[in-house]
């Protein structure tokens, strides 16, 4: 009953945001990077922050440093959705937020090099999540799979976080998917959505890794990771500026060049990640071997796909 009430309140919050976005002209116009052709409301992913806030307010202010960090990174991402901000300012907010999250994790009691590694990995994951947010349904659908897996792991395998946090975030993702996981999306996540949900998932996976002392749980983000890293490598090989907009991700080739419906592409990414997670959980014992094999297999699929279909992108 509690989660049903939260779900209803989050729906109302999203509707309220739509009114504000419409009135203030917070919209997403098609450009050279986008895979959509219609002007659409931007920033609907702010509901992810509201979901985390609902948990924080109803659970005795649990994880205060994480919540402060999420507030900072959500704020600067929302400002960036409304008006472009300088890279330096964004970095200040992002690094401050990550420092607060590291403090919540208790990371500062570990050797200094672990903090450096964590900073690099966390920055990469947040950027990857942001880059991958390019078609209807992919951010919400992929996040739904990862959060559902985390809820299952937390309940069946090893408790690593308060379950209510994951359940509340699942409610927020369901609300967002209602408006975004469709042929003509009512809203896009925006930077505020992709960055905030990435930050929440990053916090949860970090808690799991610290609790189990097993980094191989990063397999929960294997599909996004392989697509993002190999696309960066591919663009470097093409001597492109990786800071400029593009449409060279595998999912973008599927949606734009092959004309596969956005929903189908998003479902493929969801299904592949779900299969990867299921395999990891069903066949324990050699977690790092499984992680390595998964990365190799996904990389081969990526390379073969690009060899076959990237020419369609070049022809445009």
PLM regions: where:
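"…together with the soluble PPM/PP2C metallo-phosphatase catalytic core" -> "…together
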Residues: 1-229
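C-terminal membrane-associated helical module and adjoining short loops/tails
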Residues: 1, 210-316
